[in-house]
A protein has these predicted regions:
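Short, low-complexity, charge-dense intrinsically disordered segments
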Residues: 1-16, 22-36
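Glycine/small-residue-rich loop that forms an oxyanion/phosphate-binding "nest" at active or ligand-binding sites
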Residues: 114, 124-125
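Juxtamembrane helix-boundary/capping and inter-helix hinge elements in multi-pass membrane proteins
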Residues: 125-131
Length: 282
């Protein structure tokens, strides 16, 4: 049994922050893998970013490290936010937004953007499952991928450039964190589309309920820093995830790593668009 101490503040953002922190503490304290958390986090850091990490890691546990994707989003989003803040002191907001996006791509090695481009190529040019998977496996980018990636980046830049300047850093942190939850939801709901025909199938992992709750809390925590009206922005993100999951399942019977990367990019962009639209009413 436990009880929640009385919150002695009238600030809505503070209340939300303390509530999420309390829930996170409870989840962490009950995690059966508690002693392994540091190892999994550094595995996630090594795979999903280009940031320095310990060299002595057990990569057999790499699939389970996906649970820490939202926490990686805190890190990449925080660095992008810092880049935006510093760049905005010297240049126009649109330039600062571009530099923040460049920072994000450099931090992750363009991992998710590459997945999005491959999905555009595969689903744009493939007429059946086999052909779609073949195209996505090709390392070369095609017309669909190039156009899709270009339009996606332009959309992000235009939305971030139109937001209130002081709010963009927090939106970047929230966007990077929340957008890394959809890949986990797809992994839990659907099967790996390549089956046993790919060496990558050994990296397939289905998060359990507790891991999903943990990842969800981590992903949503940054929302506590934004105005209360921003909370509904998570709904379009979830709807987009449901749509993508159904679309992937209908076309190829599940997901691939590229599909997961694409879901992150779509979710991030949808979140920015949703927050921007909601703030019209503030």
């Amino acid at each position: 049994m436990f009880k929640l101490s009385v919150l002695k503040t009238s600030c809505p953002s503070c209340l939300r922050g303390e509530f999420f922190a309390f829930i996170l503490k409870r989840i962490l304290s009950q995690s059966p893998e508690r002693g392994n958390d540091k190892q999994l986090f550094f595995l996630a850091l090594s795979f999903y970013t280009r940031l320095p990490h310990p060299q002595s890691l057990d990569y057999k546990q790499l699939p389970q490290a996906a649970v820490y994707l939202p926490l990686i989003g805190w890190l990449t989003g925080g660095i992008c936010a810092l880049v935006f803040y510093l760049a905005d002191l010297l240049w126009p907001q649109a330039t600062a937004a571009i530099l923040a996006l460049i920072a994000g791509i450099l931090l992750t090695g363009g991992l998710h953007e590459d997945g999005f481009a491959d999905v555009c190529d595969g689903f744009g040019g493939g007429m059946n499952k086999q052909r779609i998977l073949e195209i996505m496996k090709d390392s070369h980018i095609g017309v669909y991928g190039l156009l899709g990636l270009l339009l996606l980046l332009l959309l992000k830049i235009s939305v971030l450039a139109a937001m209130p300047t002081s709010s963009v850093p927090l939106v970047l942190v929230a966007g990077h964190s929340i957008s890394r939850l959809p890949p986990l939801l797809l992994m839990q709901r659907y099967d790996y589309a390549r089956g046993n025909d790919s060496k990558s199938s050994g990296a397939v992992y289905k998060p359990n309920f507790r891991e999903l709750i943990f990842a969800t809390v981590i992903a949503l925590l940054p929302l506590a820093l934004l105005p209360a009206l921003s909370a509904p922005a998570i709904i379009p993100v979830l709807l987009a995830t449901v749509f993508l999951g159904h679309y992937f399942y209908r076309r190829i019977g599940g997901y691939t790593g590229d599909c997961l990367g694409a879901s992150q990019q779509v979710a991030e962009t949808v979140f920015y668009l949703s927050v921007s639209a909601l703030w019209i009413f503030i």
